[in-house]
Amino acid sequence: MKQFYRSHFWIAAGLAVAAPVVCLAAKEFSMPKAQPAFSFPAHDHHSNENVTVAVDPYDTPAKEGIFVVKYREHELLPILLIITNDSDSPIELADMKAELVTSDRTKLTPDSEDDIVRRISHPNASGTRYPVPFPTKKAKGGVNSKQMDEIQSAQFRAKAVEPRSSQIGFLFFDVSDIPTPLTGARFYLTGVRNASGNELMYFEVPLDKYLNSQRPQ
């Protein structure tokens, strides 16, 4: 009887240890469900064109949980960009340019795919790194295939927004040496064009709107 209980104990212990590894191995990135831009605290609505732009920083451990890559450990700030077109005509994003301007007027542009891969492949020596408990397949420059899939699929890539619809995706900003990148910062979006090819007025989103919404009421 004692042998029976000992066997079951070790089986249970083995399953308890293996479960986190299996969960970690199975985790994959899934883009958040698209919500209208005006539903986010930090947004700018252009009533003339009926277009709204919003940003939602993923700056907390809870929100960062959707990712495979721990971007904050690599001093990268993911910001979800949401563009909602409530007009009757499509808008074009092919010439769109995004910029994050910090409180000290430092201008940041989104990192490219290669920039992100380079940062993750060659982390700063001072950063804390945790060993992965199982072998992984490398895809590009020290980034495994699951990480590479996420980097490619998470980024905002839409070239247009159809009428009565929204497009979303992440922009990744290098915030190394910037302790509080969001406080007093403003997000600018230019190069959005209407169906006639005319450029819309630039969008300006104060990030303090987001920060204020996170404070306890």
Summary of predicted features, one role per range:
Residues R72-L80, Q167-I168:
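Short, solvent-exposed loop/turn segments enriched in Ser/Thr/Gly
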Residues K33-R72:
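Low-complexity, acidic Ser/Thr/Pro/Gly-rich terminal tails and inter-domain linkers that flank the onset
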Residues K63-L76, D86-I91, A160-E162:
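Short, solvent-exposed beta-strand/turn "edge" segments of beta-rich domains on protein surfaces
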Residues W10-P20:
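Bacterial N-terminal signal peptides
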Residues A26-A34, F40-P41, K97-D104, P133-Q217:
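Surface-exposed edge beta-strand/loop patches
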Residues V21-A25:
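Sec/Tat signal peptide C-region and signal peptidase I cleavage site
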Residues P78-A154:
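Mid-length scaffold segments of soluble, non-membrane domains
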